[in-house]
Amino acid sequence: MSESDTVAGEASPVRKIIHIDMDAFYASVEQRDNPDLRGKPVAVGGSAERGVVAAASYEARQFGVRSAMPSVTAKRQCPDLVFVKPRFEVYKAISRQIRDIFAEHTPIVEPLSLDEAYLDVTENLQGIPLARDIALKIRERIKAETGLNASAGISYNKFLAKLASDHRKPNGQFVISPEMGPAFVETLPVGKFHGIGPATGAKMNALGMFTGLDIRRQTLEFMNANFGKSGAYYYWISRGVDERPVRANRVRKSIGAETTFSSDLTEFDALVLELKPLVDKVWRHCEATGSRGRTVTLKIKFADFEIITRSRSALSPIAGRDDLERLACGLLEVEMPLPKSVRLLGVSLSSLQAGNDAEPPQLTLAI
């Protein structure tokens, strides 16, 4: 699609929406961190006797194990199922890492959960000409930095982007163009529509609606009369139309990066070498989001897992990458010599505000 492409009946350029969905997120994290779990059916959640499944690996899903299923039922369906207690702080940390990757491409990100988000890349901060290439680059970065797989859907609205990400799971991506949208929806069973639950689906079936095409054959008045305020939504999505914007409604409080060393470090020069790429990453995120901050925080985790943080605030927002590095290195230097070897080093920037730089170029991207 070119810059002049429009959806029929609309004057504005086609939006470029990406839906990113991590594949079996909680379970994949556990399999990543525990090699003994790889290739085995895994359920993250409570005990096999009294709990509920929070997430299931793809190996477990082959036996019909699903999230929100009672653990007793899951164990009955998959006798070899391995239960793992959830580690939500770990999942949250990885989710923040993934969102930092998103922020390098667009500030318009709507998180749906720790493992799922919409991105509006109609205006692309990196100037990549195709939205599908943005999705691929994001997925490759997620894999490289976290060791986890993500699926992506690319389309011109949120409803279709989410359908597209489901279409090539796991570890794939799919594009639904404006030309494909209506035909893609018309063959879809109503139970596959996001936003149509079992009760609504059963009601639609009772009214003779089994696919998107069946919904499309109804009038708006009929849908409103039978489904209230949701009727109009069902009416329009059956036509591939979804006007909902991607809402970036979460105010970012800080931008940070950290790394865990393969072997513990103690020398100042070695730590500075590790600090420099972290500063680079934080500053890239600042550039991507148009943010500037005043407070630099250094995080040090020692080999015995004790954590200390040290902060310093500037009188005005830090203007450049070198200034950020100077302040971060200064915080580290004050702590030398360190009492113990260091396992992890992190740097973050807070007291954020919008930058004074010129607005990034507005690019209408082809899907």
How should these model regions be labeled?
Residues 1-226, 232, 349, 353-357, ...:
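Gly/Gly-Pro- and Ser/Thr-rich, intrinsically disordered tail segments characteristic of DNA damage-repair
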Residues 10-12, 19, 192, 200-342, ...:
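DNA-contacting surface of Y-family translesion DNA polymerases
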Residues 112-116, 155-158, 291-295, 340-344:
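Short Gly/Ser/Thr- and Asp/Glu-enriched loop/turn motifs at secondary-structure junctions
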Residues 149-151, 297, 344-346:
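Residues at or immediately flanking beta-strands
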